[in-house]
Each structure stands twice: as C-alpha cells, then as structure tokens.
Amino acid sequence: MATLKQIQFKRSKIAGTRPAASVLAEGELAINLKDSTIFTKDDSGNIIDLSISAGGNISGNVTIDGTLRVNGPINNFGNFSTSGQITAGSSISAQVFRALQGSFYSRASTGETANAHLWFENADGTERGVIYARPQTTTDGEIRLRVRQGTGSTTNSEFYFRSINGGEFQANRILASDSLVTKRIAVDTVIHDAKAFGQYDSHSLVNYVYPGTGETNGVNYLRKVRAKAAGTMWHEICTAQTGQADEMSWWTGNTPQSKQYGIRNDGRIAGRNSLALGTFTTNFPSSDYGNVGVMGDKYLVLGDTVTGLSYKKTGVFDLVGGGYSVASITPDSFRSTRKGIFGRSEDQGATWIMPGTNAALLSVQTQADTNNAGDGQTHIGYNAGGKMNHYFRGTGQMNINTQQGMEINPGILKLVTGSNNVQFYADGNISSIQPVKLDNELFLNSSNNTAGLKFGAPSKVDGTRAIQWNGGTREGQNKNYVIIKAWGNSFNATGDRSRETVFQVSDSQGYYFYAHRKAPTGDETIGRIEAQFAGELNAKSINAVENFKVNGLSTLVGGVTMSNGLNLTGGSSITGQVKIGGTYDALRIWNSRYGAIFRRSETSLHIIPTNENEGENGAINNLRPFSIELGTGTVSMLHDVHLGNSGSSTGLLQVSNSLKTIKMICPVTINERNAALTLDSPSSSSANYLQGSKAGTKSWYVGLGGAGNDLSLYSQSYGHGLVISDNFVSISKPLKVGNAQLGTDGNITGGSGNFANLNTTLNRKVNSGFITYGATSGWYKFATVTMPQSTSTAFFKIVGGSGFNSGLFTQCNIAEIVLRTGNERPADLNAVLYTRTIGAAFKNIAVNNVSGDTYDIYVYAGTYCNQLACEWACTENATISVIGINSSTQSPVDDLPDTAVNGQVANVLNNLVDSGKGKRYEAESEIAINSQTGIRIRSNADKTGSVATMLRNDGGSFYILFTDKNDTDGAATVNGEWNSKRPFAINLTTGEVMMNNGIAVRSAALFYNSINVKDNGSINFDKSGANPRNMRIFHAGDASRGNRIEIADETNYIAYFEKAPGGANRFVVNNATVSGVNQMNSFGVNTSNALGGNSITFGDTDTGIKQNGDGLLDIYANNAQVFRFQNGDLYSYKNINAPNVYIRSDIRLKSNFKPIENALDKVEKLNGVIYDKAEYIGGEAIETEAGIVAQTLQDVLPEAVRETEDSKGNKILTVSSQAQIALLVEAVKTLSARVKELESKLM
C-alpha cells in the first residue's frame, strides 16, 4: 500500500520541466501545472509520464473536458466524430474527406501574413496542384490555383481569382472548348490562330427589339480606343436605325461626336474629309495623309500626297498630278487644265502602242442623237487594220473656227456621202464622183497674171471641155443650157483643118458667137482672127481693125469713131455719146427746103438755119435764133421768143425783141431747186416788194416797204400782218393752224392732245432735271410736297445708280417713288419706293409731315449717286419741290426727324446682272400666279427640237409636265398642250408624290421616312462598267419561312434577313466571307446581352465587358463588376491570383532616394487584423480578409497610401504592397541588427 506521501503531488509551474528521479519515491506523483502532465517513479527508478502520450489501453469511454494532446499518431479503426474543430500541427490523412454540412475551411497557419491552402498530391506525396488564398489587404483578396506542369517539371502554372474591380480572373491562357461567358475581358492580345474554319473571332449580334423610330436603340457601340491619355478617342459603331441604311462607322470625341468614316450595307463608303492611298512612308508622318495646302480640304490622293482628286465646290473636282491641276470635272463638262494626252501606254507614256483592233483611244457617245453612221459614236485614234483612223459622227455639224485656218497634211481631203465622194489633193487636184457644184461665186484672188481657170486637154478623141449653165424653169432663169467651149480641127485626120482654135458660145438650139483663128495661108505666119455672131450685136464700143460688116440692123450704144464722116441713110438709134470733132458745122438736120446746122464757133454753140432750098448742102445764114456761151452757160435767143401755147398761135410767155416787152398770160410756177424770183432795187433805201391788187385796189404786199430791212407780209384789206425783224418775228393777231391757235398771250389752244390748251398741258407736264448725292451713303432730304387729302398723287422717276463702274450694269438703274394721300380718316401720306437691283441709287424712303398738307420726303441713297436723272409729276391739286435739282452735290442729313415714318420698298422683278454673271430674275417675296399652268420653260424658243416644261396646279394635284418636241422651226408644239407623260405629281390632299415615268438618281438620295415598295417590287442595281451582274433587293417569304428581305444577283441569293413564323430573327449569308472591322451595338458571344450599353457578353447574358463612360472599361461576372480599366488606374473589385506579380522597380526609373526612418517603430504602430470587407462604402460585407488599415499606414508612411474611388464613386484609400514590403525590409534590417547585438552580448 502506498503511503500518504506517495499520493501527494509535487508541483511545478515551469513549462517542459520533468521531476528528477531523486525528488520522487517509487509511485510518488508529480504534476506540471503549466503542461497539465502527471509524472511518477517506477520500480526501476525511472520517471515515467502518466499522461495518455505514455501509451496504454483504455477500455470504455473516455470523456475529456479539456485539451487532448497527442504527440504521436492517432490510429482510429472506427468512426471518428467530433462536434468541434480538429486541429493538427502537421497533417491529417484519410482516404476520403467528406463535408456533410457542405463546407471545408483552410486557415492560414501564421496569422494574416500566411497563405491558406488546399493541396493535391501524387501517391508519393509530390505536388500535383494547390488552391490557396493569399494574405488579404484592407481592400483586396486573392485565391490562386497552382498546377504542377507534369511529374518531371519544376515549374507551375498559376491562375488568379482577385476581388478587385468587382472580381478578376487571371491566367496565362484561357481555353474554352465551347464558350467563355463574361461581361468584361481585359487582355493584351486575343489569339484566334487555332479556331475552326468558319468560326468568327467575336460576335456582337444584338437582338434589340424597339418601338418607334429606333433612333437610339438602333446603335451598337463596339469599340472605343485611344493611344494615350490626351489622345484622340475613336468609337466604332454599328447602326441599324429606322429610315437609315445599316452602317458601320468610326467617330471621334469623348462620346461619338464627329463622324469620320462609314460603310453602309450597300457597299458605299464615306469619309469626313479626305482619303490618301499608297502614300505611307516610314514613321507615318501627318504629311502622308495628303497636302492640304495643295489639295484643299477634301481630296483623294494616290501614291503621293499631291496627286489625285481635289474637291473644289459643289459638282466640281479637279484631277491633280504633282500638285498641279490637270483637269476639272464639272456637272456639265470635263475641262483639261494642262496638256491633254489620250493614248495607250504600258510605261506611263515612255512608249505608245496601238489600241486593240477595232478599238479607239477615245470614244464619245454621239449615238445619243440617233445618227446612223457606223455605231453612231465618235472615235479618236481608232485602230482599223493597224492604222490610226478618226471618226466624227452626229446628226449636227462639225465646226472648226481657228484664226489661221486648218491644215491637212498630207494634203488629202475626201468628202463622202453614200456612194458619192469628192477628194481634194494638195497638188491642186480635185476628184469627184459627181460634178462639183458651187452655191456661190468662184473668185480668183491672186494678184499674179497666171491666176485663172485652166482646162486640160481631154484624153478622148474629138473631146473638149466646156463651161455649161443648165437651163431652169423659174422666173429669171435661162430656159436652155448655155455652153462655152474651145475646140479646133487642126489635128483632124481628114476634112477641113483650117480652124486652129475656136472659142464658141452656144445653147441647146445653136451657137451665139464664135471666134476662131484661121490656119495661116500664103505667106502668113500667124493666122487671122475671125468672129461670127449668130444674131444681133449690141456693143458700147466696136473697134474693127479690118472690115466691120453688119448684115442687118445695127444698134450702137457705145462710142463710134468715124474718121471720115458718117452718113446714116437708114436711121440710127444711138444711146451712148456721139463725138464729132475737127469741124465747125458738126451736125446737119435737113430736108429739101431748110437745114438746121449745129455749129461750134470758138466758145459758143449755135443752132443756125440755112437759106431756103439749101437744106442738104447750103451754108449758114445770118440768123442766130439760139446760142449757148460755153464758158458761162448763157443762152441767147436774139429773136422773138414764145414759150408755151396759149391756144391762139402765141405763147403763154411772149418776149418781143423788137418791142422790148414781156407778156405773161398764165400763172407763174417756179419749181426748181435753188429757183428764185429776184427783185433788185437800184439803192439800199428803195422799197422792194411784191404788190397784190384786185380790180385795181391794193389788197396786200410782201417785201420791204421802205429803207429798212424789216420784211413784211401785210394785208391792206385787214390792216395787220407779219413782220420779220432782226431779232424777232412780230404778229399782231393770233396765229391759227387748222383748229390750233397761238394766241398773243403765248398760249396754244384749239389743237388736239397736249395742244388743246398748252397752258393746261404745261401745268400737267412731267418735270425733269438732275440731282447729285456724291460719295457718301445716308439719308438725304429729297423733296418737299404739298398734297391735299382725299386725294392727290405724285410720282418721281430716278434714273442712274449707286456707283459708275465699267461692267457693273446693275448701276444703270431706275427707281420710282409714288406718293398718295389718304382719305383724312386719318390724314396720311403713303410712300412707296420701287427699285429693281442691288445697284439702285435709293434704298429706302421716309416721310415727315411738316405741317398741314406739307411733307418732307427723305430717301436713303447709296454711295456715289452722282448725276441722277430725275423726272416728277403730280395731280393739279399738288405741288412738288425737288431739293438740289440741277444744282451742286447735296449732303446727307445727320438723322431723320423723330416724327419721320418709313414708307415701303418694293422690288420690281427684273433680270439685270453685272458683266460675267448669269442673267436671272430675283424676288424677295413670293410670286403668285393665278393660272393653273403657271410657268412654261422652253428649251430653245420655237426652234426645231425645242421642248417646253410646265408647272401646273389643277387644285387636286401639282404636276411637272412637258410637251413633245418641235419638228420644225416655228412649230406650235412647244407652245401647245402637254403630252401624256406624268413624270412628277404631288397629291395636294395627301401630299403623296408620284413619279409615273420612273426615276433615275445620279447621286446619293436621303429618305427621312419610309420607302414603300409595293406589288412585289424590288430595288434593282443594273450592272455597269466592270460589274458582272445585275443586283436586286426584294421582299420574299411564305407561310413556312415567314418574311424575308433578300439580296440577290442574277444567279442566286447573296444574303437575306428573315423573321421566322415563330418570331425568331435570322440573317443568312450565302457562302460569304465577311472581312474588315464592323461596328455594332452591345452584343453577346453565344448568348444574348443583358448588360446593355457598350458591352460584349460571353456565354451568359450578364458576364462580359462594358464601357461605362469616357475612359471607363469594366469587366462583369454575373452582373457583378469585378474589374475596371481607366486612365491611370486598374481596379479589381475581387481578389487577384497570379503566379507572381512584377512591379517596375528599375533604378533607372527612380531618383531622389531617401531612407525610411524608424521603420521598426512604424511597423509596431501597425496592426494586422482580420475583418469583413464590403465592395463599396455602405455596402454589405462580401468577404473576410486579413490585412492592415490604410488610415493607420497613412499615419506612419503616407507614401504607401493612395486615394481612389470604389465602384460607387466614393473616395477610398488604397495601400501599396511594394511600400509595405519596403517598410518591412527596413524594419527587419533594424530587428536583425538588434538580434546580432544581443547575440554578441550572449557570446
């Protein structure tokens, strides 16, 4: 039995202390209170541990209320159950670990700085992989998945799951066999090298369904990029808006503000400004995009920056080469501004080659005028048989108008019409199938003596060349043909050969005249000339060297010279001059009784009779009845003269030489130019007049009644008349002409029109004068008028303009002013200025009532209104005074009177323009036409081919109509009714526009509302140029396939949009490849998109990438934001797991180094804590982390803390792990120094 001593306990409070054998008796107990262990001494004197760790068997249950510590293995051959935790210092092994409540926890081993792991091992204990959670910061957490790369590898692959930015997942590579669904993806490079054939790199096929116009939801925002923080931001957008073509476009701005480029679903591409192709050099300078200084703001350059197309203005662009304009393209022409060359060359003109056989270098589509020459086209440089030919065709004419004419070299000109042709050769030859006919005279203009018409000798026997005038049938034409020809018979083989050369004029009935040279006879060396006339010969002059023989009657019209007198016995009619010289008695006219001889004696010509019965040969007698003095023309009749026939064998005027009297028994009429009846008084003081009397009583006289020079026409019967004095004409009674009478008061009355009463007419006259307002524009006082109410009217016409420049025709202007008073309810004066052009002298008008019915009129005049012609008139109850009329330059007033009232200015429709401008009518107000057919526009008056267009409003519809074309000049078609075509009409009730004869749109067309294609119609695109097929867009479908919009060519469909009967939408492309960059709204990859906005989803509807603002790109997982990219920062709202994190720390990037002082003290002020953390301030805690508090770190090391924003935009603090490491490094170095110091002391 043990003694009491043996069951008493010896105690120790020092951990790890075992009792010595000397202090215990056998069986005596000792307890270590610190370690909770019991010891005793066995019979061998050894100290043994009585705790469970000493071994032994326990039969039955063991209840331990405290801690069970087992330093060795625990072998359990049954079930192991615990209601609490199992804590192992090393590891716990089992075949299977199963969490019946659904949770496994792995806790970091050493506070908040160690990892929490879940390991995967091979059978030999080597690592396969591990899932572990990294230490947390105050804001971030991270779980990593590390996988060993094979049993023979020493490297691992790690995958990170981070809490930042709403959650991030990081892997060197993500491989999804089916799909990867996420709201946001942040990558440097997306590689699709191993994708299957036919797969797309990405999808953004949004399924927006929107009502109304869809202007907003019809936009798919694809990408937004820039190169630097302050760089231009580019937006890639796909649109499918109602009323617009589907389009991909690229915009710039913080938001899509400025559209730069676009490509539509019909293949059209548009750029904001210009396009440069093939101009890039190294480093991509801005100058590669074209030379704006040379090419302008809008251009297309090719190859270099100053070659291409340059836009100039609406409808006009230039072809530019090397910075120089070489051609301008306008709406109506192609204008070459440099030397134009058309040719075919394979080396830019170094060598030129022929065009293809039967092809031209330049063809003009002149077949439009339906000419039937060849193919109707004009060809320049046409290869026909290897030779260059040129063809000009058309139903009109070709005009060549050059100052020095036209040269054809070599000189061959061939004119062809059907089977006929005429050829002109430079050697002078003309060859014609038909006779050459001249519509006008042939004039040989050369001054040399060889110019003339020459006829070669014909090659045919007995042939001759003739000039022939064909006979006609109209008035004034010759009936028979007339021929002039030369021939002869000297070379005849037989017969008469005496006529060497014959010149003959004949018609179809025989010869008129011939002259021939006879062959010489006898001793003659030159044959004589003979002429023969077949009929009468009428000649102005005939000079016969030899015999002159006339068989019939001869009429000599010209001069006849007879050197030995002339005896005419058969009568002679001479219409020309007869010259008789060398004799005094030149001409005798005689009969058997008397002869009358025309005799010239020195300076006189006499007609002298012969003595009786000496008519033929007698000499002159002594009578001189008629003589003319040839020097003075004085005619002398020295015997009695009787002029006229009184009916009683005496003359009406009888001059008696013997009685020295003149008797006149008839009225005298002097009716010759410069004829006069002269009364010559013997002295200047004598009276000189014609006196009239009746029955011996003086009744009138005309002349000078005394010594003065006043001429009187005086009626002695009435006692008054007309006196013409030196400075005036006096009349004492009114002067009457017809019914018109000039009174002694100066008034003219009794006439017609203005002369019914001249004083009244003058009172109503239009006054005129001039005014000058000079170089200064402004308000001028123009006139003062007195105009009673009810009513009076005045008008002014001002002719001239503002300025006087050559070529500015608008300065030749007419302005008119009309003033009219009111009806006294109230009293007023209306003023209207009618003007015609911008160059008018007067621009505005104002009226100021001075008092009563008196008004001042003011006008606003332009500059340089010099020398304006002015007319004015008014009703009889009004008066006008024009200020400055016919006077010097007027000055403008400083200001209009306060009581002045503006009148109205009316612009008169006119088409006056300055030089160089197209004439047109301009109006600043509407023009109302009260006719259903309001305007008719004729293309070329009433000429052939002219056509008229008309604007018509019949009350139901508005039409644009046109007539047929005029067939001939002056035809009435162009002025007649419209034809049956209705190219354009507007229903005036519904507003519907009808184009009943088709429509051709040559440029872009904009439709701001719907386009309805009815009756299964289609939109067709005809092939042209290099396009191989026709294209069309049409509406198709049936009950099984629903509705389709289909794009097809002549062979097959290309693509169609379909809404299936079930409501699903499809877009199908027939075996097509879509390349390039497309722009669209939000879309999903193998899923729909629920993120909206500018986003891409992957796999599920709320996981993907989304742009949430300018410079903000977020990644979502299950609609939770896990990551954000923005300028300067990268945010993760979840933990980030990575195999390693490398932060740029190159010393070459750093400067201004300073040590972290008192690092250990700073560390001791920090607290590592475990906490629950929310995603944003005020949000729910979403995870438990370990870390430090940013505010505490900021107190000791502010450089390690930075302010940023949480996902809700709240300002929060973040910490730098690199800064913390630097702080800990310095603290460890300080602690290490202290340990070394303590170790040195212990040593």
Curated annotation (Swiss-Prot):
One of its GO terms (cellular component) is virus tail, fiber. Proteolytic cleavage and release of the chaperone in the host cytosol stabilizes the folded protein. Pfam families: Gp34_trimer, gp37_trimer, Peptidase_S74. The record marks S1145, D1146 as: Cleavage. InterPro entries: Gp34_trimer (IPR048390), Gp37_trimer (IPR048388), S74_ICA (IPR030392). Gene3D superfamilies: 6.20.80.10. Residues 1145-1242 form the Peptidase S74 domain. Residues 1140-1143 are annotated as: Interaction with the receptor-recognizing protein gp38. One of its GO terms (biological process) is virion attachment to host cell. Disulfide bonds: none annotated. Keywords: Host-virus interaction, Viral attachment to host cell, Viral tail fiber protein, Viral tail protein, Virion, Virus entry into host cell. It is found in: Virion. It comes from the Viruses. Homotrimer. Interacts with the receptor-recognizing protein Gp38. Belongs to the S16-like long tail fiber protein Gp37 family. This is Long tail fiber protein Gp37. It comes from Enterobacteria phage K3. The gene is 37.
